């Protein structure tokens, strides 16, 4: 996982890590973790921090070493990449940029992708994703649909 990071990213993470490694022993406490991540432009919730810490701090000693920290940051960055990809995909479908994907927009994109859909098939796709029942797909519904695939 950490091998997908660039040298610049690793250097940046090392610098931030060192700032919070007060005694220079190569570990930071779980409490300091949130501060480190915020300094790198991430904004984890308390719940996300707990999950990350539990995943990383295998021995439960309350500290995280640099290799563990790198693995965790690589995971976090991978997650935000896929979020960006979903936003871009939504823009492709939302031709008029009104924040909704209509049946016509869905049919148009699917046709361009080589999928000739009947009226019923398009309606069915909209129905499956359309949580609030307004006949079109908003961004939240689109994200749910993409994540469930």
From Swiss-Prot:
Belongs to the calmodulin family. It comes from Blastocladiella emersonii. Keywords: Acetylation, Calcium, Metal-binding, Repeat. Ca(2+) 3 binds at residues 94, 96, 98, 100, 105. Ca(2+) 2 binds at residues 57, 59, 61, 63, 68. One of its GO terms (molecular function) is calcium ion binding. This is Calmodulin. The gene is CMD1. Ca(2+) 1 binds at residues 21, 23, 25, 27, 32.
């Amino acid at each position: 996982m950490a091998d997908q990071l660039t040298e610049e990213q690793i250097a940046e993470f090392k610098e931030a890590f060192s700032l919070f490694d007060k005694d220079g022993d190569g570990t930071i406490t779980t409490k300091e973790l949130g501060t480190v991540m915020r300094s790198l432009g991430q904004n984890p919730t308390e719940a996300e921090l707990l999950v990350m810490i539990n995943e990383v701090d295998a021995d439960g000693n309350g500290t995280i070493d640099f290799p563990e920290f790198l693995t965790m940051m690589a995971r976090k960055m991978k997650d935000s990449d896929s979020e960006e990809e979903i936003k871009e995909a939504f823009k492709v479908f939302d031709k008029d940029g009104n924040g909704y994907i209509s049946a016509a927009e869905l049919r148009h994109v699917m046709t361009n992708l080589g999928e000739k859909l009947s009226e019923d098939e398009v309606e069915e796709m909209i129905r499956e994703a359309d949580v609030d029942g307004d006949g079109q797909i908003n961004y939240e519904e689109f994200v749910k649909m993409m994540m469930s695939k």
